Amino acid sequence: MHSSSVHVPLIEFLKNRIYLGAYDHHKRDTEDLAYFTVEDALPYNAFYMDFGPLNIGHLYRFAVLLHKKLNEDSTQGKGLVIYSSTSPKERANLACLLCCYMILLQNWAPHQVLQPIAQITPPLQAFRDAGYSSADYEITIQDVVYAMWRAKERGMIDLAKFDLDEYEQYERVDQGDFNVISKDFIAFASPQQSKRGGLNEPFQKVLEYFVENNVQLVVRLNSHLYDAKEFTKRNIKHIDMIFDDGTCPTLEYVQKFIGAAECIINKGGKIAVHCKAGLGRTGCLIGAHLIYTHGFTANECIAYMRMIRPGMVVGPQQHWLYLHHDDFRSWRHTMIVDNRPDPLIGNLFPLCSYEDYKQRLKEAKRKERLQLQQQLTSPLADSSVINTPIRRRKVSGALASKIQTVVPIESPGQPRKYFEDSEDIDEVEMVNNSDDENTMQDIIQSSPARYDSVTPKTKDNSDWRVLRSISTNNVSSQQSIHIIKTTTTKTVNETLSSPPGTSPTNVLRVSKARSKNRIASGNSQTSRAHSGGVRKLSGKKH
């Protein structure tokens, strides 16, 4: 192969097929080599002292020209030397284009494309920012290569689907001056209105594109140069997150921005961000989200954005992105979109610490449980909500007097009873079992209208029996009483006094022999008091 007339080595990428060279004069083809340059066809449009890297539109055009040259008959069987001038800047731009081509179209790994250009002499110049100050931060071809590789792996770039016409149209100032950075973000320069309601052509292009491409949020970072209603009346949400030109946002601002962006992305929409030129402040916030989402390093992020929109991230903003790129990547695992809206970002939701979020949820659940317990245990809840209130009936005096002579006021429940009989005791106790273990007393009163079927049919005051409740009734105060005591285990019938008229206590006494006749061993007999109620007496002799 022919040696170069200058001291720049010929770099082999594909043996006998693709080489990288540098010459200060036009080279003619030889029998072994064909020469090809794109330096004049793909110029870089500088802002100030910046010179590259060439953007993705240049990369697409380079790939088209290279494929065309490789397929020409004149290059068949020859090595193709792609060359530039010997300027370090031009050499760097061409080397960067060729490396990105090998990454995106030939699917080479980063180390494969970096190995041929490693430690070459003279070295390739690093890229600087578009600012007017001295360049104190640089990115290298290695940063660009890894940026393109990561973007390809994350599905952010596909040259086979790239629309060159659209890209080159809208990057022009008179056509809107915006670029689609990723499927989620658009970076653009601030639209301007000379008067309210008037739309110039660039602003009209921006509005039309945003409506057609589902842009749901516009974030303004600079002072007002247009009426935000131009977006909102087209159903595009608009928020202001203004900070000074050339400065960097606070981390709190970045958290709010990323949270707001996540809210829109989760709904399938896009976010458009602008400052005055759509480069510095815009690059800070979009870059922070790219690092948060895709794991770029700061240098990779800057390189990627400049490949899409040249000049992004200026001056100290480069250092800021480098200092905080670890924070942005860690937020992916330590922060979450909050559930409390933030008025600063149009009531969208910012990022918040995952631990704080969990603690707040626990505290909210604890307060909710405590409030529920207080409602359940409050007297008002017990009486008016849970339990139905008991309504007590009022009974007149005349009716109460009649009830007393007919049935007991309180029921003994469901008794289980038996007799205890003793030869040495003249009276027999009847103990009635009750479920609530309260002693109930029923007064058995003799009645002149009914006779016992067991005892002789002679009118005797001791034979008259009815049921009445304990009360102070003047009419029956001179009559005999019989008391039945009720407990949970037995029923005992006890005669408390002698027949009526013989004792001031007026308690009926029943003889032992008579008790045995009324309750026979092995038989169950019923004694009815027809005037008031029924008392069933049963039991065995012990």
From Swiss-Prot:
Active-site residue numbers: C275 (phosphocysteine intermediate)
- Annotated catalysed reactions: O-phospho-L-tyrosyl-[protein] + H2O = L-tyrosyl-[protein] + phosphate
Q: Which gene encodes it?
A: CDC14
Q: What induces it?
A: Both during budding and hyphal growth, no detectable levels are observed in G1 cells but, as cells passe through S-phase, begins to accumulate with a peak being reached during mitosis.
This chain's function reads:
Protein phosphatase which antagonizes mitotic cyclin-dependent kinase CDC28, the inactivation of which is essential for exit from mitosis. To access its substrates, is released from nucleolar sequestration during mitosis. Plays an essential in coordinating the nuclear division cycle with cytokinesis through the cytokinesis checkpoint. Involved in chromosome segregation, where it is required for meiosis I spindle dissambly as well as for establishing two consecutive chromosome segregation phases.
Annotated keywords: Cell cycle, Cell division, Cytoplasm, Cytoskeleton, Hydrolase, Meiosis, Mitosis, Nucleus, Phosphoprotein, Protein phosphatase
Matching PANTHER family, A to Z? Answer: TYROSINE SPECIFIC PROTEIN PHOSPHATASE AND DUAL SPECIFICITY PROTEIN PHOSPHATASE (PTHR23339)
Query: Sorted alphabetically, which InterPro entries does this protein's record hold?
Result: CDC14_C (IPR044506), DSPn (IPR029260), Dual-sp_phosphatase_cat-dom (IPR000340), Prot-tyrosine_phosphatase-like (IPR029021), PTP (IPR050561), Tyr_Pase_AS (IPR016130), Tyr_Pase_cat (IPR003595), Tyr_Pase_dom (IPR000387)
Which residue numbers delimit the Tyrosine-protein phosphatase domain? 177-334
Biased composition regions of type Polar residues, renumbered to the chain = 518-529
Any one Gene Ontology biological process term?
A: positive regulation of mitotic spindle elongation
Location in the cell reads: Nucleus, Nucleolus; Cytoplasm; Bud neck; Cytoplasm, Cytoskeleton, Spindle pole
Say which enzyme class the record assigns.
hydrolase
Q: Which family does it belong to?
A: Belongs to the protein-tyrosine phosphatase family. Non-receptor class CDC14 subfamily.
Q: What is its main location?
A: nucleus
Give the protein name, as stated in the record.
Tyrosine-protein phosphatase CDC14
- The UniProt annotation puts the region (Disordered) at 516-542
